[in-house]
Structures are given as structure tokens and as C-alpha cells.
Amino acid sequence: MFRNYLNLPEILTQVYLNKYAILLILILIKLILLETSILDNLNSVLLDNSICDNGEIQPVLNTVHYMIVDSLQTLEAAGIVSIILTLKVIKQLALFFIELFFGTYICLLNAALKGSTEVALDASEGVIRAVNATVVSATNDIESALKGLSSIINDLVTGFNAIKNMFTGSKSDPTQYQNKINITLGDLKSKIMIPSEVLTKLDNFKNSSLYGLSQLGNGTQTIVSTPFELAIKKLNTMKSSYNFTTGAPSPINFREECLKDMSKLKDVQTDLAKLVEKISKWLFIGLVLAMVGSILYVSYIQWRHWRRMDKFISETGIDKEVQFRNQYNIYNNFLIYTIVKRMGIELNERTIWMLSFMFSKISRNVFFFGIMGVVSVVAQYILLNSVQSSMNNHIKSFDITSNSTSMSASTIYLRDMNTYIDDTQDKLNQELFSGIKEISVSLNSTIVEFLDKLNETLSDIFGSTPLAGPINTVVYCTIGRKLEKVEKGLTWMNDNLNINIPSISRDIEDGLSHMTFLQPQSVLARANKIIDLYRKSILLELYISLGLLGVWLFQIFVGSATLTIRYWNSTRQGNNSYAISSPHELSEQEKQVYGYPLSHPLIDGKDLTTSSSFYPTTEEKSK
């Protein structure tokens, strides 16, 4: 009878595929991959100079640097502006006090002297103009008479000349005497009249006689204000051309500072790599020894199980061991039992042996590990493919949204911040100086109104009397000039009393504009890279699962080779020798031919037909 079950040597050929060895192999593969990944990551992370090429850090460092420098520049500029304003205030106060005390006396003295000289000069000018008018009038009358006389004489001369020409036949110019008379009168007129240059000199003297006195006050103010003007001019020049960044340190260069530490990281990477390789080597040796131990353990378990089965067969008195083991193999293997017993499909003994070899307890572990791995890979691939497809759709939608956005976040921030600075400046000036400006405007209005009413009152009282001019002069010198200076001071204060908060500088704007912020599509792109990494790990799982299935399929080759060897051995033994076949029950004819075996009737009271250990004698047969 052909043996369809696996004997002990055939079982031991599969002990290297036990579940413990498979798990240890998977752990070993995991360890090897982890070691490779750690070494690669150490090289790529610790020794990768691209870490120092992070374009997101340098703009931040530049922005912080420019914010500090800009704050110092603002402080320096504010100091210069405050000094300029202080000098202007001191200058105006000094000029105001000069005007308050010294300007009054100069104004009154100027008015008094100017009034006296103008009276004298006006009188002289009146006399000269009267004399000239009289002389001109007289000379004009004389000139008219002379013109009449000249006409008569010219007529007589013309007549005489005509008579003379009748006798002499010559001609003469009739206007020669007339020209002589006219010229003589013109010279006489110019000699008698007072020259006009005298009046011009009087006017110039009147206008310039008090020039030095009027310049005395202006010179005093100029002497006082000149140092202030020079200082203010220098400060304005400094403010417009001063290089605030002189001496300021350069921004931190992230790449240079990062590369300085790369040599230290290289030493760290070398030490870590040696540590990983050393520990991995010992773990690898331990796992290999554990696999060898699992093979020995499973071999012992299979040998013990086979020995117990032999003991069971011998103790129960089973004389048909091959037949018993064949039946036991069919019932013990779930696949063969399902095909033969449940489905009723007849299989020959060699097919049953091959199925037993392919789906033994050891071999089917490899098969199920491989199948479950492939199923897991398919499920993970479906999940990752769905997630990646959805993520790509989201990336496209974000790209469309970002393209439709006209301004970046930094541009919006700069615009809003400048608007906030302007609003804060207006609000601060409004809260701090609005009351003062209202008071200054009110005082200016009051001063203007007071001066208008004062002039109207003086005009009503003195009108066009001779006292109107001196009174107006005295009032202007004592009151009007002071009020005008106060009015100018209030106007200057109203124009300059404000706080100017500087806007964000161009350097800070450039730094913020170069900063890259977190974008949804960039995050999704990174997640997409992670999915690609998972895809690679899934492919590795697929390779491992296919490798397990390949090992299981390799059992077909081993089983076929084993069957071939068994067939070759059985053929060779059949041709060379004969062997006693397995015992089986005799048929009725065989019992008659060989004699029916009987058991001894006195042994255990067994039925006489159930034992072949006692044969009857001839005498018993004859009976």
C-alpha cells in the first residue's frame, strides 16, 4: 500500500519553516531595514548641508536685525528732531524776549526820530516845490511873450530878406534868428529853476536817515538767532544725510553659523553609526541563534510526536500501520478531509501525499503568512490610493485659490500695520494735543479780534487828526508787536506740535516679503511625500509576502522530487527483491485452502474466529 502521509524525515525537511523561524526572520528583516534606515537618516540629516539652506530662517533673522536697527534709527532721529524743536523754541523765546524789552524802545525811538525828520524834510520839500512852481510859472509867461516877439521879428526879418534878395539875387535862412532866441530862453529857464536832483536827494535822505536805527533791532535779533540757525541747519543736514547704520553689526548669517557645527555633527554621526552597527550585529547573531534554536525545538517536538504515535500503534495492537496512518492523515489534514470526506472527491495516494506535504502544519503557516501579507498589501494600497487621490484634488483646489488671491499675507500685514501706525499717530496727536491746538486757535482768533477792535477804536477816536499817526505808532510798538509775536508763536506751535510715528522701514518690508508662511498646499505636498514613503514600505511588505509564497511554492518542487525518488526506489526494490506485504484478513476461499485459524478457546474467552494465534490440530479438524 502506498504511503500518503509524511514520515519523520519528510516532516523534518520542513522544520525550518516553523512559525517561530518565520517570525524571527521577519524580525531580522525589520532589524536590517531599521539599521539601514538609521544609517541613511544619520547621513542625510546630520551630514546634509542642505539643512543650512533653510530659506525660512534667514528672513526672520534679517527682520529681527532690521527691527532693532530701525528702533535705534528711530530713537536717533527722534533725538535729532527733539533737539531741533528745542533749539527753535529757545530761539523764538529769545527773540520774543528781545522784542518784548528791546524792540519796544527801538520802535518808539524810530517813530519819534522818523516823525521829526519827516516834518523838517517835508517842509523843505514844500518850499522847494513852491519856488520851482513860481519860477516855472514866470519863465513860462516870459517864454510866451518872447515867442510872440520872436514871431514879429522873424516876420520883419523875412520881409527884409525878401527885399534884399530882390536886389542881390541871393537866398538866406529865415529861421536862424528864431533858433537863437529859443535856445537862450531854454538855458535861462534851466538856470533859474532849482534842480530836481535836490528833491530826489531829500527823498532818499528821508527814507535812509533812520535805516541804521531800524537795523539795530534786526541786527540784535540776527546776532541772537544766528547760532541757533547754524545749529538747526547742521542738525537738518545730519538728519537728511546721516548714515544711521554706520557701525551696526551685520545680521546673523544662518548658513555660516550652521556650517560651523557640521564638523561636530560629523563626529557624532560616526559614533552613532558605529554604535548602531555594533548593536545590530549582536542582535543579528542573537536572532540567527534563536532561529537555529527554534528549528531544533520544532524538530524535537515532531520527533516526540512521531514516537508517541508509534507507541500508540504498538500499544493498541494495530497491525496495519500504513493503513491506519493513511486514514489518520486524511482526518488530520483539514484540506484533504474537506476534499475527500466532505466533497466526496476521490484522490490517489500520491496526490494526497503532495497535499499533505504542501499543507502540513508547518508548511501551511508559510502559505497563510504569505496570503495574509498580500491581502494586507492590497487593503493598504486601496486606502493609500484613495487618500492620495483625495489629497491631490485638495492640492489642486488650493492652487486655484492661491492663484486667485491678489496679495500675500506679508503684503496685507504691512498694509494693515502702516494703516494702524497712521491711525495710532492721529489718535495720539488728537488725544495729547487737540486741546492745546484748540486753545492756540482760540487765542489767535482772540488776538486778531482784539487788534481789529483796537484799530477801530483808535480810528474812531483820533480819525485823521495829527495825533492819529503817533498814537497808532505808540500803540503798535507797545501792544501790537507783542501780540503779533504771540500770534506767530501760537501758529508755529500749532503747526509743529505733533508726534510723527515712523512707518515700517523698507528693510523690514523686504524681510517680511521674503518670509514664506505655511501654505496648505505645501503641507499637503509633504503629506503626499509621506504617503509615497508608506507606499514604498507597502511594496516591501509585498516583496516579503511574495517571498513567503515563493518559499511555499518551492515545496512543490521539493515534494515532486521526493515523490520521484520514492518511485525510483520502489521500482528498484521491486525488480531486485521480494518483500512480505502487509498482513490482511484472509478471504473465505483462502481460509479453506490454508485452514481456518482458531484461537485457543480457554484464552480470555474470546470468540474462536477472532484470533489467528492458535491453530487446531488434525484431530480437532476431523472432529
Curated annotation (Swiss-Prot):
Cysteines paired by S-S bonds = none
Q: Which GO terms describe its cellular component?
A: mating projection tip; plasma membrane
Q: Would you say which domain of life the source belongs to? A: Eukaryota
Indicate how the chain sits in the lipid bilayer: Multi-pass membrane protein
Q: Spell out which residues lie on the membrane's Cytoplasmic side.
A: 41-92, 303-365, 559-623
Q: Where in the cell is it found?
A: Cell membrane
Q: Which InterPro entries match?
A: PRM1 (IPR026777)
Family to which this protein belongs: Belongs to the PRM1 family.
Q: What is this protein called?
A: Plasma membrane fusion protein PRM1
Origin organism is Candida albicans (strain SC5314 / ATCC MYA-2876)
